[in-house]
Amino acid sequence: VIKNLKKIDSLLLAQVKEVTLDFSESMHSIVKACFPNAMITLDRFHHQQFCLEAVQEVRIAFRREEMTRVANEREEFRLMLKSFAEKGEAPTDKEGNPVRLNAAYHPEKLENDETRAEILARSKYLLMMSPNKWTDTQKKRAAILFREYPEIEKAFSLSHSLRMIFSQRCSKENGQKSLKKWYKEVGEYGNKAFNDIAAAMYDKEDEILNYFVNRSTNAAAESLNAKIKQFRAQLRGIIDRNFFLFRLTRIYA
């Protein structure tokens, strides 16, 4: 990439004022080598995506625990019925209510008629959204989820607060103050995934904060990349690369 970019007149390369990119070290090296006067801005959506993934990790961990708990309780219920049958006694549940010998185990349901495993599974997408975009059903589900799992609420709060930091229009200095508060909250939470994200952001903080200068993102490049991939998939492969590039320039340039 550097070799091909160097074919462009150095005066033109020097006119580039800003480049947005992700956390890729290779892309960082390319920009440093080819665009000496460009300000590097790390795309805000990439570190926000890392936070969303960290929230999902917390949710999935709780769901796995719940699935294990339900499986254990189902087995205990089966063994209890078997024990009553062997003794020739009428089975009863923990509250003393009569139970059939062939009864199936049903996990406890919450007030929205979902089990804990179900609410953990169905909360995936609401945890990726801003609360102001939730439907009434999602609002009710979120309230129950956060009440039952405060750790998920804290993880979501950290992810959402980072989104809000980059949604505000402020100076680079004020953005830095907000980020420092966010680092502190992450440290108090003590989750490894969030700690890793905060450490990576702290290491590249100046380039992340450059977003507040022009509010530039990678959105246009990501959109074009998606269109090119879709176009390539429709062709079911490329035989003549030069002709493919010619078609791309005619369609998208």
What are these regions (language model features)?
Residues 2-7, 11-35, 45, 49, ...:
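Acidic/histidine-rich catalytic cores and adjacent linkers
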Residues 52-64:
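Short, surface-exposed amphipathic charged segments that create phosphate/polyanion-binding patches used
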